[in-house]
Design a protein with these regions (language model features):
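N-terminal leader segment of winged-helix/HTH proteins
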Residues: 1-31, 77-79, 94-96, 100
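Short, Lys/Arg-enriched charge-dense amphipathic segments
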Residues: 3, 47-65, 79, 104-113
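Residues at secondary-structure transition points
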Residues: 3, 7, 31, 35, ...
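N-terminal helix-turn-helix DNA-binding core of bacterial DNA-binding proteins
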Residues: 21-66
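Residue-level detection of beta-strand scaffold positions
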Residues: 38, 62, 67-71, 82, ...
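Basic amphipathic alpha-helical segments that dock to polyanions
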Residues: 41, 56, 71-77
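Charged, amphipathic alpha-helical coiled-coil/dimerization segments
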Residues: 72-115
Length: 115
């Protein structure tokens, strides 16, 4: 990798970090959510409100152990539910409270992402 390519990667990372910081602040202030929580809930909602945990981890491009760390507080606050499906695998379901909060937070995210 050339120095220019490395610098381009570092610049992209810092831009991404700044965006996440701003979105964490906006969503946290108004809805008590982190950007990562919002993304997870959005992906779950787009999957029809429920998905196997392994599929969710794959879609989010995160290890299953990291997904579990994200899910535990969301489950504790009643936004999602984890349960074994018929195959003994874990299935994650977006609860009504989570769907409501997601739809409320969507306007904040749209406003924050607007140029």
């Amino acid at each position: 990798m050339s120095e220019e390519a490395l610098q381009a990667c570092l610049d992209r990372h810092l831009e991404h970090a700044a965006m996440v910081f701003m979105l964490d602040d906006e969503l946290g202030t108004h809805h008590g959510l982190l950007w990562a929580d919002f993304v997870l809930l959005t992906v779950l909602d787009a999957a029809g409100g429920a998905a196997p945990a392994t599929e969710l981890a794959r879609t989010l491009r995160t290890p299953a152990s990291h997904l579990l760390l994200r899910l535990l507080p969301l489950e504790k606050t009643g936004l999602v539910e984890r349960a074994a499906d018929g195959d003994g695998k874990r299935r994650v379901t977006l609860r009504p409270q989570g769907r409501r909060l997601l739809h409320e937070a969507r306007d904040t995210a749209v406003d924050a992402c607007a140029p």
